[in-house]
C-alpha cells in the first residue's frame, strides 16, 4: 500500500489497498496505476470489483451496490474492472465472504454474457 524513494530496485509488488465499488473509484484506480508506473514502480495491482456493500464501519465498506451481484449496475462495473485489470501483470479479487459467494455464483454467466455480445 505504500512506497518510498528507491523501492524500485527491489521489484516489489504494490497494491492500492481496500477500496469501495464505484465508477469513481475505478477511475481513480486507473490514474493511480499510471502514477505508480510513471514513477518506476510497474508492479502494481488492484482488487477487482472492490467491496460493493455497505457492511460495517470500515471506511472501504462503503460500496454503492447493496444488492450486490444481483445489481446490474454492479455487474457492469465488475466486468469493466476485470477488463481493465486483465492488462495488469497481477490482479485479484478481495471481498467479504458474502460478496465472494455472490461473485463466484454469477461470474461464469456474467463473463459469457459480455463475451458474446
Predicted regions and their residues:
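Catalytic-domain carbohydrate-binding cleft regions of carbohydrate-active enzymes
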Residues: 1-117
Amino acid at each position: 500500500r505504500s512506497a518510498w524513494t528507491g523501492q524500485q530496485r527491489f521489484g516489489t509488488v504494490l497494491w492500492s489497498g481496500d477500496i469501495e465499488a464505484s465508477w469513481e473509484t475505478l477511475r481513480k484506480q486507473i490514474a493511480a496505476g499510471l502514477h505508480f508506473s510513471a514513477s518506476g514502480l510497474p508492479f502494481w495491482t488492484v482488487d477487482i470489483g472492490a467491496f460493493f456493500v455497505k457492511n460495517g464501519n470500515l471506511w472501504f465498506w462503503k460500496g454503492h451496490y447493496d444488492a450486490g451481484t444481483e445489481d446490474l449496475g454492479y455487474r457492469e462495473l465488475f466486468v469493466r474492472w476485470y477488463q481493465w485489470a486483465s492488462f495488469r501483470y497481477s490482479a485479484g479479487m478481495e471481498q467479504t465472504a458474502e460478496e465472494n459467494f455472490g461473485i463466484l455464483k454469477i461470474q461464469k454467466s456474467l463473463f459469457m454474457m459480455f463475451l458474446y455480445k
